[in-house]
Amino acid sequence: MRFKKYFKIKYKNNNVYEHDLIHFGDFGLKSLGNCNLTSEQLTASLKAIKRVIKKKNFLIIKALPFWMLTRKPRDVRMGRGKGSPAVKVYPLKAGKIIFEFKNVNETLLLRALKSSSLRLPVPTKVVKKYDKRTDCIKSSW
């Protein structure tokens, strides 16, 4: 067997997990809901970001798909085992940071994240890193 067949994920609640912080960059895109984020949705939002910000080495992806979803073919009767692996997903929970950005102009970043969040299946918000020296509160738009 090439891929492990996992059980289906059941999301218990839609509470936003506030303790997921920005570690590497200055800004981040935080999810506000639960979903299975597919690799196609992730690449579509990445293309939308890179279309606006033409810089390299500015983006850190924290949500990489690792979970295989299985599907049975059409017109197949019930039973006879689990289906074959079809789609790779990332089980995204509310409050998790999807992308982190560093050394990027703030106005360009907001425009890029607005276009990329339209391609994601969950509502999102932009968060800023907490600075201990100036004691600034983490801001969000």
Swiss-Prot record:
Keywords for this protein? Mitochondrion, Ribonucleoprotein, Ribosomal protein
Major localization listed first in the record, in broad terms? mitochondrion
Q: Family assignment?
A: Belongs to the universal ribosomal protein uL16 family.
Protein name per UniProt: Large ribosomal subunit protein uL16m
**SUPFAM superfamilies per the UniProt record, alphabetical:** Ribosomal protein L16p/L10e
Domain of life (superkingdom)? Eukaryota
Q: Where in the cell is it found?
A: Mitochondrion
Q: Coiled-coil regions in this chain?
A: none
Q: Pull one GO CC term from this UniProt entry.
A: mitochondrial large ribosomal subunit
Its gene name is RPL16
Q: Supply the Pfam families for this chain.
A: Ribosomal_L16
- Does this UniProt record's set of keywords contain Transferase? no
Q: Which NCBIfam families match?
A: rplP_bact (TIGR01164)
Question: Does the record's keyword annotation contain Ribosomal protein?
Answer: yes
- What PROSITE patterns does its record include? RIBOSOMAL_L16_2
- BP terms from Gene Ontology: mitochondrial translation
Q: Which InterPro entries match?
A: Ribosomal_uL16, Ribosomal_uL16_bact-type, Ribosomal_uL16_CS, Ribosomal_uL16_dom, Ribosomal_uL16_sf
Q: Name one GO molecular function term.
A: structural constituent of ribosome
Q: Which CDD domains match?
A: Ribosomal_L16_L10e (cd01433)
